[in-house]
Amino acid sequence: MAELTIDPATIRKALDDFVEAYTPSETPTQEVGHVATAGDGIAHVTGLPGCMANELLTFEDGTLGLAFNLDAREIGVVILGDFVGIEEGQEVRRTGEVLSVPVGDGFLGRVVDPLGRPIDGMGEIKSEGRRILEAQAPDVMHRHPVDQPMSTGLKAIDAMTPIGRGQRQLIIGDRQTGKTAIAIDTIINQKKNWESGDPKKQVRCIYVAIGQKGSTIASVKQSLEEAGAMEYTTIVASPASDSAGFKYIAPYTGSAIGQHWMYNGKDVLIVFDDLSKQAEAYRSISLLLRRPPGREAYPGDVFYLHSRLLERCARVSDDLGGGSMTGLPIVETKANDVSAYIPTNVISITDGQIFLQSDLFNAGQRPAVDVGISVSRVGGAAQTKALKKVSGTLKISLARYRSLESFAMFASDLDAASKAQLNRGARLTELLKQPQFSPYSMEQEVVSVWAGTHGKFDDLAIADVLPFEHGLLEYVDRNTDILTTIRDTGDFTKETEEALDKAVDAFRETYVTKAGKPLVDKKTAPKSVTPVDQEQIKAGKAQEKK
């Protein structure tokens, strides 16, 4: 029998023929895992060894999930959306993508969910691209100093705690103290800039509603529509009925939409209403995923939760487009306690805070800004020259009034100077009252604050302060060019001050008080006296009667 031999050349030729004839299968391969447990907006998934942190996963019913915990045995997934249809044993697939949202001018005037999907029934949104949610904040070398004003239209804020474009200014206070009202008024105040058509003045606004009632979000949208502000505003809505995952990512969605405009040279204003509810949602997610709790049961990285969000608000250098994103985060306190965990975290991250006092709000002082605690660390450099000149003594005067007011409650007799301070402080406090949806222009704020700090309201009854102010602004606008001069120059010169002084004196001669009496008796020549002199005269008359 002949011996069987194999020729190496034959083997090589057979292998080459096989390789040349081989065609790989066109069937795609994909990692598939299975739901081990699901509930409360959380799912534990097994069988996805290649999954990345923050990767998007898809469940059988199309619901998206965010890979949050990567353990050796399983993955902790935050379900983004309704989790009712997710059950044990269902398949889970990787997408190979991180969470991103569509961006572009098509979002102006629209209401979207935290995934960027329209929920206002107005059809699809035409996007200009996509932007990842976990984007890096601009570094120090690519930031520009804050030196342009972001006017709120509120006298109490623009005069004492000014905000600049690119600043992070915290609005903090108890529930029902007017925090959202300040943010909405600031958005409405940008209407004139938008209608000017000047890209350098226009501000695109984003309102992020986190854990709010659906009726509240609808009310905000209606208010913006009635004021004509919705055309330059985007609302990112995550109402109280949404899952904790949606409340967690909603602020990042709004920030991603705003960053697209910022890096294209646009100015953006974003309101986070409010970050307390985002922190609570993040706490519930972390506890359900068995992450170690810390102070007040919040996870250890809750500071990073807010810092990486708010650090994206900046005014960037020309190399990155020269745009800006101004952040107005809102935080709710309990019993005016600003030393709690989340409030102190956000205060340390932001560039200042506007503290709203519930006692002031209940006393009718609205906006209820507490002058003593409120501060703007960088906004002073952005304040217009005119407003800076007239408001220099306002904050000090009000602070002295507050301290003297509490002392006067227990003092039976005060000297004339103290009474004069109380008299002016009460009228300045009344002057700073402002109803909602009635923002002032910068030049109107200058005239109003100047008149208040220069004693033009001192001899008025408290009830006459606001009517006198409204009449004065109308008189100055109708009979002089003072408002136009301040608006065009942005300055308050000595000549403008002299002209305003004459205009105020002329208006005083025509003003009739609420009691029906003229403010100035034309039959008697007015005597020039100081408020202290007036108090001394009154005290002398009282002694004569005795």
Swiss-Prot record:
Coiled-coil positions: none
Keyword flag Translocase: yes
Residues the entry annotates as binding ATP: 173-180
Subcellular location: Cell membrane
Domain of life: Bacteria
Compositionally biased region (Basic and acidic residues): 535-546
Name listed for the protein in its UniProt record: ATP synthase subunit alpha
Organism, as annotated: Bifidobacterium animalis subsp. lactis (strain AD011)
